[in-house]
């Protein structure tokens, strides 16, 4: 146990943690040079394409240190993006230390800061490392000072390395051995193992990644999952050296996988504790806090017969992604589907892409909404995450919208642009601190504004230098209303949205104009209206196609023409009463893209 080191790497997107982990694997000989592939740990296609890490992965390496001892390094890779902070806290719960990797050219970013504080709250030892020193713009001295200034940990003797060229990687390994404490735990106590992650394998069933806190787990042991109380047998246990390698037992302090042939997807929830079936532990380990979804959207399969496959896909995906929440929903316009809760917009995109890719589904998503707190005139408080569930205006005493505290780090030359953006998004400034070249600004912003397109616009106004990290703080009263779209007087439930009253005219006009372009012309006029309650605020009409009925009258009498035109008019009127309009899929998608 003295020779085990469990650690993870905290870093901002693009600061090089996946490359650094590649180097560590190479130096310790986890894979031969032939098998070495760039970003070994980013195993999902999506992760490679977008160049981001989404899922936590783990690797066990043997490293022969300079003091002659062989150390077992258990390295758990973590994502850097703010939407996946939950994955990060899970990875950190299994470690005793973390490497804080910072790009020596760019300096500290807001999400790194947030994850670093998470690590310090969990009492982990954080070891700073300056990466990318091979770049011409690298300035390790300035960045080291910045780490001390902003994060508040000692960084003057931080290791300088370049994961790309391999300079200083040996020193990184030595620092891990020297500065990160070995795991604590009692090998003779009853087994307690924390499930860090689970995923579904079509051949093996559920595979769980676990960290043994106390005791040990042998192959063939009967264990039970503490939250469900079910017993299972460990068919295989082992470690990843990135490849799956079987072992006979996992000892205290180790990180490895357990396969018990579980078919039931929710049999091993993430954050749960495993213990032995006979004389097991009394209490479960403190897990992770359950995260609440922040953004909800309705997701519907394009063809209704895909509904069953969609449900199975969601079940499998939710095993792997513990923060996903879903419940069935039906819509008169789109049929049956699910209402899915996400942590943020990137999470939403990734989930939708994974569903479409890994499970071959074709999906359509309604506009994302946040959860509103509604106080009714009867005095009760309800939480609404779907605009069409909002009660009638005269029953609402007060609407409250969720407010987030956003911490933005931005180079000072872009500060003005960022402040303008925050004011436009109805934000209030709380704090501003200068750290050398960077400014840390804190704003309270309505979450609805943040989830729409705030992140993209923040990046574009600051040329990509600003970074953002936000968390929910409270509900505030706000003048929010539901904007309905009516087509020929009928509400289309999938197009309803909740927005601020100051915004309705602008939004309503934009919406009806967009819809007018997309709804195909019929034989009768189609009225498209945007309404709040019973008040119509914008309207446009898709004109009818009409036949030239007077074409066969040569010269002729005007009363003859009038008769024909009136007859046509009557017919159109009758059609309008019975005709109904199909809203094409493109129209729904266009509404979502309207913010852009």
Swiss-Prot record:
It comes from Shewanella baltica (strain OS155 / ATCC BAA-1091). It is a peripheral membrane protein. The keyword Hydrolase applies. GTP binds at residues 14-19, 131-134. It is found in: Cell inner membrane. The keyword tRNA processing does not apply. One of its GO terms (cellular component) is plasma membrane. The gene is lepA. This is Elongation factor 4.
């Amino acid at each position: 146990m003295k020779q085990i080191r469990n650690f993870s790497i905290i870093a901002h997107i693009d600061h090089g943690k996946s490359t650094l982990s590649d180097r560590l694997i190479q130096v310790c000989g986890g894979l031969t040079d032939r098998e070495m592939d760039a970003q070994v740990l980013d195993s999902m296609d999506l992760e490679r394409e977008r160049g981001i890490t989404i899922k936590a992965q783990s690797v066990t390496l043997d490293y022969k240190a300079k003091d002659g001892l062989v150390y077992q390094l258990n390295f758990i890779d973590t994502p850097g993006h703010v939407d996946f902070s939950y994955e990060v806290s899970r990875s950190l719960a299994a470690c005793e230390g973390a490497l804080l990797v910072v790009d020596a050219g760019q300096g500290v970013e807001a999400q790194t800061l947030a994850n670093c504080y998470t690590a310090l709250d969990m009492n982990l030892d954080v070891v700073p490392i300056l990466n990318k020193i091979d770049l011409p713009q690298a300035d390790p001295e300035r960045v080291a000072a910045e780490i001390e200034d902003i994060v508040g940990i000692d960084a003057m003797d931080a290791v300088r390395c370049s994961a790309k060229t391999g300079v200083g990687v040996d020193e990184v390994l030595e620092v891990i051995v020297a500065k990160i404490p070995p795991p604590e735990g009692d090998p003779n106590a009853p087994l307690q193992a924390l499930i860090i992650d689970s995923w579904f394998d079509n051949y093996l069933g559920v595979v769980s990644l676990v960290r043994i806190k106390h005791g040990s787990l042998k192959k063939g042991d009967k264990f039970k999952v503490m939250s469900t109380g079910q017993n299972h047998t460990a068919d295989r246990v082992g470690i990843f050296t990135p490849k799956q390698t079987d072992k006979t037992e996992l000892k205290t302090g180790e990180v490895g996988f357990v396969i018990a042939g579980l078919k039931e997807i929710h049999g091993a929830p993430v954050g749960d504790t495993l213990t032995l079936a006979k004389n097991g532990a009394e209490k479960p380990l403190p897990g992770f806090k359950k995260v609440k979804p922040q953004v909800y959207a309705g997701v519907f399969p394009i063809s209704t017969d895909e509904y069953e496959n969609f449900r199975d896909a969601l079940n499998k995906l939710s095993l792997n992604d513990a923060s996903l929440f879903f419940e069935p929903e039906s819509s008169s316009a789109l049929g049956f589907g699910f209402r899915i809760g996400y942590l943020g917009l990137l999470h939403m995109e990734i989930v939708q892409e994974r569903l479409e890719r890994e499970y071959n589904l074709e999906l359509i998503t309604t506009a994302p909404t946040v959860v509103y707190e509604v106080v009714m005139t009867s005095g009760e408080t309800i939480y609404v995450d779907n605009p069409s569930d909002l009660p009638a205006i005269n029953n609402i005493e007060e609407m409250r919208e969720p407010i987030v505290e956003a911490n933005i780090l931005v180079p000072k030359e872009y500060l003005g642009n960022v402040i303008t953006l925050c004011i436009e998004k109805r934000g209030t400034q709380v704090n501003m601190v200068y750290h050398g070249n960077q400014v840390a600004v804190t704003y309270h912003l309505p979450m609805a504004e943040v989830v729409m397109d705030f992140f993209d616009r923040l990046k574009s106004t600051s040329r990509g230098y600003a970074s953002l990290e936000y968390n929910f703080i409270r509900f505030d009263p706000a003048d929010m209303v539901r904007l309905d779209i009516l087509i020929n007087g009928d509400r289309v439930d999938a197009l309803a949205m909740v927005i601020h009253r100051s915004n309705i005219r602008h939004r309503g006009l934009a919406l009806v104009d967009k819809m007018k372009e997309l709804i195909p012309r019929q034989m009768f006029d189609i009225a498209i209206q945007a309404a709040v309650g019973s008040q119509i605020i914008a309207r446009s009409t898709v004109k009818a196609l009409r036949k030239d009925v007077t074409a066969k009258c040569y010269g002729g009498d005007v009363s003859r023409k009038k008769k024909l035109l009136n007859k046509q008019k009557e017919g159109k009127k009758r059609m309008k009463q019975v005709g109904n309009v199909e809203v094409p899929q493109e129209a729904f998608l266009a509404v979502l893209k309207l913010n852009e």
